[in-house]
Structures are given as C-alpha cells and as structure tokens.
Amino acid sequence: MRRRPRTSALVRNQRGATLVEFGFVAFPLCLVIMGIGDLAYQSYLNAVTKGVLDRAARAASVGTLNATQIDSFISNQMSTVMSKQATVSVVKTSYYNFSRIGKPEKILTDTAPLGSYNSGDCFEDANGNGTYDTSSGSAGLGGADDIVYYQVNVSMPRLFPMAKLLGWPATQTATSSVILRNQPWANQAAPAKVCS
C-alpha cells in the first residue's frame, strides 16, 4: 500500500517564499530605480548644459572666443557627459539693444497703411542686410556693446530603455539659453537708415 503525500506539509513549508515575494516586487522596483536614474541624469544634463553655456558666453562677451571657438568649446565640454550619438546645436543671435529682441526692425518713416512696413517706408536696418526683417537680430556674435542671445540644444538617446514603457520620447533633450551684452571694446556701430 502506498502512502499519499501529505499536502499539509507543503502548505507549512516556508522555504522559497521570499523568492516568490521578490518576484512580485522586482519588476516595479527596477522600473522605479531606472525612472529615478533617468530623471536624475536629465537634471544633471540640464545643469551641465547651463554651466557650459554660461562659461562660453562670458568668454565671448569679452572677446576671448569667436563664434567657431564657442561651438568647439561647448561640444568639447559636453562630450564628457553625453553619449556618442548626441547632437549639439548652438544658436547665436546679436541685437543692437535689449528693446529690439524678438521685435521687427524699427520703422522710422511710416506711410499708409500705418503700423506695418510697406514700400516707401524708412526703417532702421539693425542687422545690416539692407532689407526689412520681422526679426531685428543677425546671426553671430555682433560687435562691441551688442546684445547676444545664445541657445544650446543637446539631444541624445535616453540612458535606460524604459522610455516607451512610460510614454516618454526615446530621446532626451536639454536646452539652455542666456543673453549677455558684449563688452564695449570699441564704439558700437549705429544701425543704418534704409528707405525703400
């Protein structure tokens, strides 16, 4: 006669219970750890981008770096904290004064219809290209005493492969901008008056 195994012995057996409990907790725990790591790296990338841009802009405002050197400086400094697939773009726009940032070139003599540029109007050619522009800025570092707007965009793949799981984009970006006035190492060139 064969004895039947006692099921009560299996019910009382506690060996391996921790492994089963850890199995329930492991996946959410890994997600939380990777999520915190991803958010922490994003904050770190933003802080480094801001610091590098501030240093480059300060050096450019006193004439230490030219436009090409700024791009190289920022790329070299950022290469230590970003992946090989990352892209860095630097935008430099100069303005004659603070009040002209983001505004069209100033109309000096306005003919009908008033309030908008049309043929026969005279305007202050702030960017020196000889045509009326809806943005008075010009690309580059400008000259002495000019206002320069710097913007850096860094885009790279995320460190952890969990972006799709949480609905995040597969790439992370860091953007930083700063506005500085160049030092007055010479007289500021006044914008020309152009009439059409």
Predicted regions and their residues:
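Alpha-helical assembly-interface signal, strongest on the long, hydrophobic N-terminal helix that forms
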Residues: M1-M78
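Short, conserved structural patches
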Residues: R2-R3, D54-S196
